Amino acid sequence: MKEKISKIDKNFYTDIFIKTSFQNEFEAGGVIPPIAKNQVSTISNKNKTFYSLAHSSPHYSIQTRIEKFLLKNIPLSASSFAFRKERSYLHYLEPHTQNVKYCHLDIVSFFHSIDVNIVRDTFSVYFSDEFLVKEKQSLLDAFMASVTLTAELDGVEKTFIPMGFKSSPSISNIIFRKIDILIQKFCDKNKITYTRYADDLSFSTKKENNILSSTFFINEISSILSINKFKLNKSKYLYKEGTISLGGYVIENILKDNSSGNIRLSSSKLNALYKALYEIKKGSSSKHICIKVFNLKLKRFIYKKNKEKFEAKFYSSQLKNKLLGYRSYLLSFVIFHKKYKCINPIFLEKCVFLISEIESIMNRKF
C-alpha cells in the first residue's frame, strides 16, 4: 500500500493543478467554471456512451495533473485490476485458475451510476478546508468542476463522472474501494475468490462449495453494491462449472477437481488474424486484406496525384500495425506464463507459432 498522502492546500492546487489553466479567470477573482458541453464529444458504441474531452480544454490539462499528482497516489483495493499500471486482464483472471466453480456479475451503467455526492465525500479528505477563490469556490468544488460533466443522461439533466474522461477510471477505482473491501470480507468468510475489472466482478470456489449458484450469494452482493447505489445487471448473471468464457478469455479446469486450471483464448478471438495470415499466403494485397478482414477503409478525399501509391502505402502501414498489435498481444501471454504458469499449454504453443509467423511476414513483406 502507498504511503498516506498529505492534504492538498490552496498553494499546491494553484501551482500544480491549475498552473496556466484558467489563468485569466483566476487572476480576475473568478471561479473555475464547469466543463462546457461544447468541449465534449459524445461517442455511442452499442449500449454505451463515451465522452471525449477536447485536449484544448483547460480542464483536460487539469485532469492530467490531477491524475498524476493525486489519483495515482491514492491506495486501491487488492481486488481491483482495471486501469492500473502493471495489471492486466490476465492478472484479473489468474486467481480463479485454482478453482472449479465460476460466477461472473456485471454492474449496470458503472461509471454513470457513480453518485457525485459520494465522490465529494470520498475526496473531501484529500483537500484542505480552504477556498480557492475567496468565499466563492472551495478546493473540493474546483476539483469537482474539473472531473464531472453536467449533461442529459437517459433523458434527464444530471451531473456525473463521464466514461471516457482521463480522470474517470482512477476515480471509479477509488470510489469502489469501500465496496471491494466489503465484498472481499464476505468472500473470505465464505471461501470465495474475488476479483474486479471495472464493472466486471468475478468469483470462484472449490468443487465442494455451492454458494455461487445460490440466491443468498446474489442478494448479499446486491446488498453490498447498493451501499454506493450500484445495481447488478441480473440478466448478465453467469454461473459455470469447469469452464467459463469472459470476453473471449477462457478459464478452464477440465478435470473439475481441485488441481490448477489454465487460461486460453477462444478460437473466435483470433479469427481475424488467421484470415489475414491466410490472405497473405495467398498473395492478396494489403488493401484487400484491410478491407475484407479488418473492415479498414480509406476515407474519401480529393487526390492531387499518385492515388494508387498513396493507397498502397496507407493499407500497407495499416496491415503492418495490425500484425504488430497481434504480435504484442500474443507475446503478453508468453511473458505472463513465465511468471504465473497458468496459460493453457496447447494455446501457448499456438502463440509461439503465430508470433513466429508474424515475424517471418514482417521480414519478407515490410
Could you describe each region identified by the protein language model?
Residues 135-139:
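Beta-propeller folds
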Residues 187:
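Conserved hydrophobic residues forming the short capping helix/wall of the S-adenosyl-L-methionine
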Residues 1-132, 143-165, 174-184, 211-366:
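Right-hand nucleic-acid polymerase module
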Residues 104-108, 164, 168, 190-208:
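Catalytic palm active-site di-aspartate
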